[in-house]
Amino acid sequence: MNNERIYQVLKGLVFSEKAQVLGDTAGVQVFKVDINATKLEIKKAVEKLFGVEVVKVNTTITKGKTKRFGRTLGRRSDVKKAYVTLKAGQDVEMADLGDTAESAAE
């Protein structure tokens, strides 16, 4: 998997109370991912980008709501989240992302 695809697959971390509790207790990190990304792609992207070992990946798709924008009806985009379980004792640090991005650019 090339670096361009990694950054297409992983859109960012999810910062919520549920994600915080899962990260602290169960070693699970929550990412927003591309709607077309597979579990295998997500696993490879996290392992390559953060240098951690992934045990399993669970995904969920949240359907976008229909909302009113003035007079017209619109629809928000669907969002796919990946719950990534890491090997015991490992953690994803945002500082790791900066180091990897710099080394990948070289």
From Swiss-Prot:
For this entry, list what GO says about its biological process.
Answer: translation
Task: List the GO terms this entry assigns under cellular component, sorted alphabetically.
Answer: ribonucleoprotein complex; ribosome
Q: Name one Pfam family in it.
A: Ribosomal_L23
Stored Gene3D superfamilies:
3.30.70.330
Q: Could you tell me the keywords of this UniProt record?
A: Ribonucleoprotein, Ribosomal protein, RNA-binding, rRNA-binding
Q: Give a GO molecular function annotation for the protein.
A: structural constituent of ribosome
Similarity remark: Belongs to the universal ribosomal protein uL23 family.
Q: What does this protein do?
A: One of the early assembly proteins it binds 23S rRNA. One of the proteins that surrounds the polypeptide exit tunnel on the outside of the ribosome. Forms the main docking site for trigger factor binding to the ribosome.
Q: How does it assemble?
A: Part of the 50S ribosomal subunit. Contacts protein L29, and trigger factor when it is bound to the ribosome.
- Specify the protein name: Large ribosomal subunit protein uL23
Organism from which the protein derives: Acinetobacter baumannii (strain SDF)
